[in-house]
């Protein structure tokens, strides 16, 4: 049954609690662990760790807010079909999708469906865990608590650009998803 467009809104998922101290990434997530579907994946990623490998160290943050974009949502870049710009949205789940908005910000997403179906989860906020000095580099005016709050700041903190588009979060590389302690509290869900 088709959902009327007027009722479709991106789903925002947030973690209500801070990460336990001393958390470490145990291992890279495997594609088989990622649920199929944007809403399920958005919820699953809360509490996981986003890792950016750099020549001089590692930046790491606990995912605390995500936003699901469904194929039938007019706000989803896949809504009007595949183009060269949004091709990564249509790859198997777990692929990086990066786009540039307002002439100023990169947005970091992960593809969320089976190959050929365009859907994504936008990373909206991270709790910095490691590499805070590297996150601040060139952004000294940003308070530590705000370094990765908001999707534009998150991408800037991780130094993500369009060149990451299409990479695999589940394969060895400069950007990957790791396992972490799941939040003990309730995970909130709302429409935007």
How does the language model describe each region?
Residues 2-192:
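Conserved, well-structured core segments that form or line functional sites
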């Amino acid at each position: 049954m088709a959902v009327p467009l007027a009722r479709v809104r991106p789903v925002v998922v947030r973690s209500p609690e801070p990460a336990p101290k001393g958390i470490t990434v145990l291992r890279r997530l495997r594609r088989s662990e990622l649920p199929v579907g944007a809403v399920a994946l958005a919820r699953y990623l809360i509490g996981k760790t986003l890792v950016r490998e750099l020549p001089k160290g590692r930046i790491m943050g606990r995912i605390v807010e995500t936003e699901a974009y469904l194929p039938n949502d007019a706000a989803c870049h896949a809504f009007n079909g595949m183009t060269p710009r949004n091709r990564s949205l249509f790859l198997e789940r777990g692929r990086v999708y990066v786009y540039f908005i307002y002439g100023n910000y990169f947005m970091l997403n992960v593809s969320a469906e089976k190959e050929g179906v365009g859907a994504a989860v936008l990373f909206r906020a991270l709790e910095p865990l490691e590499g805070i000095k590297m996150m601040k580099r060139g952004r000294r005016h940003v308070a530590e608590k705000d370094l990765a709050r908001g999707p534009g700041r998150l991408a800037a903190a991780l130094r993500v650009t369009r060149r990451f588009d299409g990479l695999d979060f589940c394969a060895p590389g400069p950007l990957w998803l790791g396992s972490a302690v799941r939040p003990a509290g309730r995970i909130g869900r709302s429409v935007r």
